């Protein structure tokens, strides 16, 4: 049986994984449509590697592969899009 590599990130409204939260398994080119634009202060990467971006359409991004209990000030409440990254060599 073929097993699919699942990617999952959980985002939080406050530092230290507090406040409202939401999980994503897919790319979101505008978090505004999900009610999460510029609201994320901490996050947990449950599986995979992710790209978080300060602008819609995946612009001004950085790659993350682990939990962040306190996003740096220039990323706190500044994320507008996110997407899972494929492992190296995957089509």
Model-derived features: where do they sit?
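Compact beta-sheet-dominated domain cores in extracellular/mature segments
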Residues: 1-91
């Amino acid at each position: 049986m073929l097993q699919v590599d699942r990617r999952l990130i959980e985002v939080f409204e406050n530092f230290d994984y507090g406040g409202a939260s939401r999980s994503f398994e897919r790319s979101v080119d505008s978090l505004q449509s999900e009610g999460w634009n510029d609201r994320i202060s901490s996050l947990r990467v449950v599986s995979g590697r992710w790209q978080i971006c300060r602008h819609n359409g995946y612009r001004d991004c950085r790659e993350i592969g682990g939990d962040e209990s306190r996003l740096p000030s220039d990323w706190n409440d500044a994320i507008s899009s996110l997407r899972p990254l494929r492992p190296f060599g995957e089509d």
